[in-house]
Amino acid sequence: METRQLDSESGITLFEVVVAMLVMTVGLLGLAASIGYAVTVSNRGRNLTNTKLLAVSLLEQMETLRNTEQLTFGQIANQGAVDNTGATWNFSGFPTGFNAISINPGPDGIFGTGDDLINPGADNVYGTGDDFNDTSWGVAGYSREIVITNLSTNLKKIKVTVRYPDGGGQTRELVAVSFLNNDKRANFR
């Protein structure tokens, strides 16, 4: 019977296993970092998209208020510059400065006004004694400023600035501008 001597250099050494594990660990750490970056960029994009939608919806609301005659052209103004002549109700105007963005339009039914955070209370009727200011209706991290400028007797510039969280812990601003004429008919008629 013949005995064969095993080659001592066959197989994997402990050193090779440790090196392979080290390379794999570095690769997995890099993958984890890239996933974190992807989530941050995704949040940033989502917040920017939401901000654009908020700004555009407010600009479109101004045209709808005029077209449906819920407000007259003179009433679409900041507080202190409202002309209630010929209106069916007195409107106080859109507040100046940055204010919370609410999920509720408040008792006047118009987003962007000073009453947006008013909760009707337990009776669910506005204007009763149980109404209260409900800050939970504000969209966390978001605020807006509405500036309405009269360019002529028949033309207004509406500028909406929205402050929003960018997903990286910073607050950014998005500015949207539109022009509103004193003609409730659609431009294509």
Indicate where each model-derived feature is located.
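N-terminal leader/signal peptides at the extreme start of proteins
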Residues: 1-12
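Exposed boundary/loop context
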Residues: 4, 20-23, 171
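Aliphatic-rich helix starts adjacent to a transmembrane/signal segment
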Residues: 10-56
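Low-complexity, Gly/Pro-rich coil/beta segments used as flexible assembly/activation regions
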Residues: 49, 53-189
